[in-house]
Amino acid sequence: MSERIFIEGESCKSAWHNATAGYDDTDTHLEILGKPVMERWETPYMHSLASVAASKGGRVLEIGFGMAIAATKLEEYNIEEHWIIECNDGVFKRLQEWATKQPHKIVPLKGLWEDVVPTLPDGHFDGILYDTYPLSEETWHTHQFNFIKGHAYRLLKPGGVLTYCNLTSWGELLKAKYNDIEKMFQETQIPQLVDAGFKSENISTTVMDLIPPEDCRYYSFKKMITPTIIKV
């Protein structure tokens, strides 16, 4: 039942930070400004992303906290520090509460990633997991590249790893244009990653079977793809 999430010219950016974080009673859905930000069925996929981001140990940067699915999994791995950027007030409050119960050092950073990330030092992270929600129709399919091209390469240590997703975009691409998830990634993501400084031979993907519920508004494809992008 995936539907078009943004109408032409729509932007939520100015209202996003203080909009209500709509966690439902069963804690299986998060909506903000009527947008379906995250759902619990994504858990196996979020765990896959977390395993990649934590694979080098050390200091991990996570951009977007959401329902803490990836964040909680990351805390199970042998990492040293876990830096998390989140801009929504309600989600950030949940992050602060969650942080007090975790085994590793948590560094919560409040704000839009566009404002926070430029303040972070070069070569600081062993792993990065980027999973934020698009805040406008204009950046629906491209916001991850704004981060990756502007900052991901410089933030990683040599040998560090980046993983990311944009399910709101990929769900639309797999509905409207592609029926092969690996071809979608190859054609729409790889060229942008190479432009950002990563080498194609250091980019790999794994695909998992995962069936979204019928009522999911943003993703209906029955496979998910996890990228592993190494800085050398």
Swiss-Prot record:
Keyword annotations from UniProtKB, A to Z: Methyltransferase, S-adenosyl-L-methionine, Transferase
Role: Converts guanidinoacetate to creatine, using S-adenosylmethionine as the methyl donor. Important in nervous system development.
Family classification: Belongs to the class I-like SAM-binding methyltransferase superfamily. RMT2 methyltransferase family.
Binding locations of S-adenosyl-L-methionine: 16, 46, 65-70, 86-88, 113-114, 131
GO process annotations (BP): creatine biosynthetic process; methylation
UniProt pathway annotation: Amine and polyamine biosynthesis; creatine biosynthesis; creatine from L-arginine and glycine: step 2/2
Gene3D superfamilies documented for this protein: Vaccinia Virus protein VP39 (3.40.50.150)
Binding residues annotated for guanidinoacetate, in chain numbering: 38, 42, 131, 167-168
GO molecular function: guanidinoacetate N-methyltransferase activity
Species per Swiss-Prot/TrEMBL record: Xenopus tropicalis
Annotated catalysed reactions: guanidinoacetate + S-adenosyl-L-methionine = creatine + S-adenosyl-L-homocysteine + H(+)
Family annotation (InterPro entries): GuanidinoAc_N-MeTrfase, RMT2/GAMT_Mtase, RMT2_dom, SAM-dependent_MTases_sf
Subunit structure: Monomer.
E.C. code: 2.1.1.2
Location of the RMT2 domain: 1-232
The name this protein goes by in its record: Guanidinoacetate N-methyltransferase
